[in-house]
A protein has these predicted regions:
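Structural detector for tandem alpha-solenoid helical repeats, activating at a conserved register
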Residues: 17, 33, 53, 75, ...
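Amphipathic alpha-helical scaffolding segments comprising HEAT/armadillo-like alpha-solenoid repeats
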Residues: 1-5, 29-43, 70-83, 107-121, ...
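Structural signature of alpha-solenoid helical repeat scaffolds
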Residues: 46, 50, 83, 87-88, ...
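Extended alpha-helical scaffolding segments
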Residues: 140-143, 157-203
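HEAT-repeat alpha-solenoid elements in large eukaryotic scaffold proteins
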Residues: 3-18, 47-60, 89-96, 126-134, ...
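Structural signature of alpha-helical solenoid repeat scaffolds
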Residues: 63-64, 100, 138-139, 175-179, ...
Length: 215
């Protein structure tokens, strides 16, 4: 069965398992043809609701590979930009995360994704998309002081409009770019971390205190 056919039947729990299985074939067996096909399929029939399972499944494969081997995906990053405009959030959150994983290797394309991140923050559609967007901003802002200046206003906006349980990812993103912020910006991040250092959630406490140790 072809990759396209497998992804066409890609739904529910099968979707997650299939994405992981295909990604492992790329990572462990160097089946780069799978990766290249999934990059193309991440924006397949972008306006068609019926094709959303194909797009989201392909995007998941690309995300898993990009996390482990960003250099394999970075040269093709421009082909993934159209996937940031598709209707289903599953595809968008996977690909905005890919943009972060590959940002330091193909910054010119990753910078183009900022416009999409801005839209996602203005209209937050669930925790997965919001958190992936936050982490993208952190990854991009971690590259340089100049890049941090581009993304920090958006991260501030995301903090101000945070949704339930988003704080962990906002803290992680803030930690990533903290060293590239000026003193006043760092003070804002520290104030945000102080709000969460005594959270009832241990993971949140750890992330907050990780930032506070930088002061």
């Amino acid at each position: 069965m072809s990759i396209f056919e497998q992804l066409s039947n890609n739904k529910g729990n099968i979707s997650s398992a299939l994405g992981k299985a295909l990604a492992q074939k790329v990572l462990q067996e160097n089946q780069m043809d799978i990766l290249l096909e999934c990059i193309d399929l991440a924006s397949y029939q972008a306006l068609a609701t019926a094709s959303r399972h194909i797009r989201s499944g392909a995007a998941k494969v690309v995300e898993i590979v990009a996390e482990k081997q960003p250099g394999w995906v970075a040269p093709q990053l421009d082909k993934l930009l159209p996937a940031l405009s598709v209707q289903e959030p599953q595809t968008r959150w996977a690909i905005i995360r890919v943009m972060g994983f590959c940002a330091c290797l193909n910054k010119s394309v990753a910078l183009q994704a900022i416009a999409f991140a801005e839209k996602y923050i203005e209209d937050k559609q669930g925790l997965c998309l919001a958190s992936s967007t936050d982490l993208f901003l952190g990854d991009l802002g971690a590259i340089s002081r100049e890049d941090a200046q581009k993304v920090f206003p958006l991260l501030e906006q995301s903090i101000e409009s945070s949704i339930e349980n988003e704080q962990d990812w906002l803290l992680e993103a803030s930690y990533k770019l903290f060293g590239n912020l000026d003193q006043s910006e760092q003070a804002e991040v520290l104030q945000f971390a102080q709000r969460w250092q005594y959270s009832s959630r241990k993971n949140t406490q750890q992330r907050a205190r990780q930032i506070l140790r930088l002061s």
